[in-house]
Amino acid sequence: MNISTLENIVSSVSGVLTDYVMVTVLLVAALFFTVITRGIQFRMFGEMVRLLIHSGKRDNDHRKDDEPAHGTISSFQAFALSIASRVGTGNLAGVATAIAVGGPGAIFWMWIIAIFGAASAFVESTLAQLFKVKGDKSFMGGPAYYILKGLHKRWWAVTFAVLITLTFGFAFNSVQSNTIADALRTSFGVPTVWTAWGLCILTLVVIWGGIQRVSRFSEIVVPVMAVAYILLALVIICMNITRFPEVMSMIVKNAFGFDEALGGTIGAAMIMGIKRGLFSNEAGEGSTPNAAATASVTHPVKQGLIQTLGVYTDTLLICTSTAFIILCSGIFEDGHDGIVLTQHAIDAGLGTEIAFGSTFVSIAIFFFAFTSIIANYYYGETNIRFIHDSDTLINIYRLLVSAIVYAGAVVSLDLVWGFADITMALMTLCNLAAIFILGKYAVILLRDYRSQLRAGKDPIYRSSTIPEIAPETECWK
């Protein structure tokens, strides 16, 4: 079997899984969790913001005085770590591709999957907190842990752990490094090999410092770059404010096939919007819970709510910023795609006399994609430790990730991306099946949280609240 045949097979399988199976299940899950949580993503938005504002400190009230200081990651650091993974090439290049292929209407469906999918993010992140365990230096958790402890299915948990390690630790990281190399070569003429070596060494330095260094790095870099990018989008929108009503009209009409002359159909818009929305905000995918579990909080729902806000931050702020930059520029039908379209759109939106699209996007891509590499690495580490907690194995994994980052920068990624789509779809289905079953615990915790809020308390959870799962919640005794 030659490479071309293998690429065709992989493309066909990934197409069926991502375009039909995963999209359908994601929508069903999003609606189901919205119903059983009674619209948590809408009715507790104010509480999400309040928690994020006060999330900079570590919350250790649920820890006994004689226990070591596990959970040295603040709620905000866990939020920044998850945003670091979410905000990457999908926000700049992925949105551009969605518009180029699915038309402006893809943005509408990206909003829909974010708004309703946020309920899935709440459930999975709350479960990650509930079933987290104590590691040597911090808490650890995620789907593999709640599948094992909540469902007692080790084979299922190990399957997920392998899939997320392959998808995030290797495949997605190679895509991120490839995008960085392309952007730096296009804008500054940096040889690809130089970028590859630089990323390889920088990745090793950061990931060898452990989760504390990873979280501190994300805590500093992610907010700065996100705010800078949003401000740029606002400047472009203000400079092209007369086009704003037209842009909103394009998005809505194209989303429902009323203006197919703009490109795409309702089916293409929906599929591209949902696919790119998932790749970007990761709601229901099973990746974010690995970051959510690291936070030290007094109640699992606190981190569930903060991670719900993360979906909004990623899609409704960052992705929407890219969309408006592209659509306000009026060049989305010029034949460009991916990161090149975003670069040209910034130039067009600001005007040629102050054009710096290539430069700014290259810098943004570097920071967004590199923080994604670091967060993706951590997701893999957490799941490798779940399978077999060995420092030697982790050190080998660190070296392999650095090698993959190097290789990703210098090789074609068509086949790798196809495999990544397949493993991403499978891990998403694994996770969604688990949270469909375990979601009842998140609902019980939510009721407990709201009850304490109404009583004027700062909610604190103890395992005795849910006696039937008390033996499996070792961090909440």
Label every model-predicted segment.
Residues 61-99, 127-130, 136-144, 148, ...:
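Alpha-helical membrane segments and immediately flanking helix-loop junctions
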